[in-house]
A protein has these predicted regions:
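C-terminal regulatory domains involved in ligand/effector binding and gene-expression control
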Residues: 1-56, 61-272
Length: 272
């Protein structure tokens, strides 16, 4: 199988960590892989760009335990790959043709990932967090779509009420929000808004249509597109490309990587 590997240049012996779903050890805040006690975390954005833009067998040199978050999207990675260009390797690319429908669900969380047989690879994502701000959002990625333009610039998002405990424990610094869209679901009292202005060192911070105005949205379904970006990054951990149509509702790194393990097992059984 054609898989990418991370090389931890900051550690003695420059250990290698394969970017495969078998090595996933944590999905709480992004996807983390580990081999021989060495980890690399938040790999999904760079994996998304590499995989979708057709790069296999990459060696990713890294001098830290986490990939650079950049602006919270895969834009910088996609731009670098597109500008550098991709060279053909002297090897045939392996594809797994999906032969039967495969379903993965976490019913209590409303999560579902379904894979159907198809001649091409495509992904549709639906997000619904019972949020009056986000509402129902859909995003699709079909063969021939421009990933670098359409998907890679879409940034990660977080709900303000999820941030509040972290803010109270001083785990969030001012610059931390330059790479996340903050969704404000509930009314924010004036004193809390003042507190946010101080933390983020932005005196003109305000809430606009349910979002903190630290960032402008890049498109109206940016959140669904970002979930799609993440899902593509987790698909990269299969180590083989597939021909099939994916439909995902409320995907997340735990569900994505569990689904990949299940799919990998199916592929192994099929002996491809």
């Amino acid at each position: 199988a054609a898989s990418d590997v991370y090389k931890r240049q900051d550690l003695e012996g420059q250990p290698i960590i394969p970017a495969l779903c078998d090595y996933v050890v944590d999905t709480s805040r992004g996807t983390t892989i580990e081999s021989g006690g060495h980890r690399v975390s938040t790999i999904e954005h760079i994996m998304s760009a590499l995989w979708t833009l057709g790069v296999d067998n990459a060696v990713i040199d890294i001098d830290a335990p986490e990939t650079p978050i950049m602006d919270g999207s895969a834009c910088a990675y996609a731009k670098a790959i597109t500008e550098t260009g991709v060279a053909d390797q002297d090897a045939e690319r392996k594809f797994y043709h999906v032969t039967e429908k495969m379903v993965y669900t976490i019913p209590e969380k409303g999560v579902a990932i379904i894979l159907y047989p198809d001649d091409e690879f495509s992904v549709s994502v639906h997000v619904d967090y019972n949020s009056k701000v986000i509402g129902n959002q859909y995003a699709t990625f079909n063969p021939g779509d421009n990933y670098a333009e359409k998907i890679s610039p879409c940034r990660t998002f977080v709900f303000l009420h999820e941030l509040e405990p972290l803010i109270k424990m001083n785990l969030i610094k001012g610059g931390d929000l330059d790479n996340a869209i903050v969704v404000v679901e509930n009314p924010v009292p004036a004193d809390q808004l003042e507190h946010l202005k101080k933390i983020f060192n932005k005196p003109d911070i305000e809430i606009k249509a349910g979002y903190l105005n630290n960032l402008e949205l890049r498109c109206n379904n940016e959140l669904a597109r970002h979930k799609l970006l993440d899902l593509l990054g987790d698909f990269a951990l299969l180590g083989v490309r597939i021909k099939g149509r994916v439909w995902a509702t409320r995907p997340g790194h735990f569900a994505n990587t569990e689904f990949m393990k299940q799919l990998k097992h199916t592929i192994r059984r099929a002996g491809e």
